[in-house]
Amino acid sequence: MAEPIRPSTVLPANRSLFTLTTADGETLVGEVASPIGNSTGAILCLHPLPTAGGMMDSHIYKKAANRLPAMAGVTIIRFNTRGTTSEAGTSTGTYDGGRAEKYDVEAAVNYCFDVLKVQELWVVGWSFGTEIALCHAKDPRIKGLILLSPPLMKVGESDLAFWAEDGRPITALVPEHDDYLKPD
């Protein structure tokens, strides 16, 4: 009989910490959790607002890294944007409201393709992470975006126009009982 999956369940995976350097010289810390066998795809996780406690270990992303490699064969890549701290460490730099974080997203995407050699990369943003996904995760190698509780406070019309014309899939999820957003 299979064991039930509980909130703290950690399933087998290859896990490794990494650091990467952004184009403007910041050092970011992160973790890759990949399946023991073949990977069917990869997810790059962009965390919630760091000034409100968001980080790579935010519960949804931590649970994804703990389970999806074993359950779905998916590689999970999580990292802290500039000035953000988690168990893995602190990324250098200072939170910049989504502006300089473009270098963080670009460095992480390049790491996924150039170092990890992923083939199928999706970007998942949560809250603030949705904003930096829409603004900065435009690399044509990315297959699509999944947006969790997108506030759309810092996303410009040009960013929305880009994605409207681009044609890659975007899925946006706004929970009915979100602490900050209410679906119309």
What are these regions (language model features)?
Residues 135-144:
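Conserved hydrolase catalytic core segment
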Residues 26-118:
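Serine-hydrolase catalytic machinery in alpha/beta-hydrolase-like enzymes
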Residues 165-167, 171-174, 178:
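Short beta-strand/loop motif that positions the catalytic acidic residue
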Residues 158-160, 168, 181-184:
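Short alpha-helix in the alpha/beta-hydrolase fold that links the catalytic acid
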Residues 1-41:
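N-terminal cap/lid segment of alpha/beta-hydrolase-fold proteins
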Residues 153-154, 176-181:
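Acidic catalytic loop of the alpha/beta-hydrolase fold
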Residues 124-133:
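Gly/Ala-rich beta-loop-alpha elbow adjacent to hydrolase catalytic centers
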